[in-house]
Structures are given as structure tokens and as C-alpha cells.
Amino acid sequence: MHFNPPLEPATLIKRYKRFLTDIQLPDGSERTIHCANTGAMTGCATPGNTVWYSTSDNAKRKYPNSWEISETDKGHRICVNTARANQLAVEAIENGTIVELLGYNALRTEVKYGSENSRIDILLEDNEKPPCYIEVKSVTLLDEQVSTKQQISTKQQASTEGQGFFPDAVTTRGQKHLRELTEMVESGSRAVLLFTVLHSGIEKVSAAHHIDAKYSLLLKQAQDAGVEVLCYKAELSSTQIQLKQAVEFINS
């Protein structure tokens, strides 16, 4: 995914009303931009940090600029625009980056499925194999102070370095998606939970049991039923974002 024109830097003043963010431009002027993220954004929205924003050519938009990337005081970059995760996933499937999802001849998005009235993010189809239902989640929570159960049991040293978690807040919607992915597997289809790691400091991913214990339990049950979990990390810059490499999922 390329940004044209390239993203521009500013300083974060505050985020408010869920969708709005005030920033200070390099010339000292202030501007309100759109924030396409209604989540907790833990560690992603610290006032004073650098933000990178895009500019839309849609003249009808009230706020033509969108917050795309945060840059922390440690130099980590985080894509905070939640709409990008699905776009990046589609791009990575189509260009062959996600090798586990090769071999299908059709890709559709936002297809109705399941018994709880959901839409699957990506549906892969092929005449020679069962359909593959893919739910995409964006991972931006880096918490190096929390150990997973697996890390504690194996007494790994410095094992929390680069530890990312999902979700960053209780997600009943995410819980529903896990139930429906499990339902798809039980009906004979393939189901995949794809974590797009959009934080440059995250090197591995776990379910955030300390934040949403029910989600963590449902994810374990989904895996036991046959739902696959894939994690792919993005490279982020002011000119492009691309999913580049697989990272480990640690089942806590």
C-alpha cells in the first residue's frame, strides 16, 4: 500500500470524540484531522508524540486529513487507521506474501456468513477445495510487562520483549467472530484468524487474557476446533505500508 502523496508529520495534541484528533503542524499552526479508530489505542495516542497523516482529494470530506501512523518516543511506528488492516491483508494474499493462503482462484470481501449475522472480511474460493473464511484483526498493543502463561511455565528469560497482544479492550464483536469461525470449520470449511501486526516493536502475538479472558478462551477453543491463526508483521514508512513477514503466535 503506497501513500501518494506521502504522509506528512505533525505533533499530537489530543484525541477526542472517538473520531477526531487535534495536531500541531511543523509551522506551529493547529489542525483537526479524522481518526479512523474507535478502540482504546493504548500506547498509540500519547500527546506530544509524532503522528503521520494522509490527505484525501475528496472535496466533500469535512476533515480531509486522516491519522495513519503514530511514532512513539522509542521510535516505534504504529498504524492506527483500522481500515488499513483489511486492505493490507488483501494485498498480501494477492501478491503471495501470505504463503499459507496461496492456491485459491477467487477472493471476495465483506461476505455475509455465520449464524450471528456477520460479514467475513475475506473469503477465498476454489473449485478444488473448501472455501476459506478469513477474519482480519489489527494488533497494535505492545506490552512488555505482561507474560503469557506459556512464558511463565517455561521460565523464559526476557521473553516479554516485543510481546504484542490482542485485543486492547474487551471485544464482544471479536468474540462473536471466533464463534462463527469455529462454526465454519465444523461445517467443513477452512477458517483463519489473521493478525496483521501494525506496530514495529511487536515480534510475537498472544491473546490478551488479562484484558478479555472470554476472548482468550474462545480463541483457544477455536484453535482446538481447527481454526488456524496466522500473524504477519508490517513494515511502515511515510510512503508505504506492507505486510512482510510471519511472526509467532504464542497460545497463552
Swiss-Prot record:
InterPro entries documented for this protein: SfsA (IPR005224), SfsA_C (IPR040452), SfsA_N (IPR041465)
Domain of life assignment: Bacteria
GO MF term list: DNA binding
Coiled coil segments of this chain: none
Family (UniProt): Belongs to the SfsA family.
NCBIfam families registered for this protein in UniProt: sfsA
Protein name (record): Sugar fermentation stimulation protein homolog
Organism: Vibrio atlanticus (strain LGP32) (Vibrio splendidus (strain Mel32))
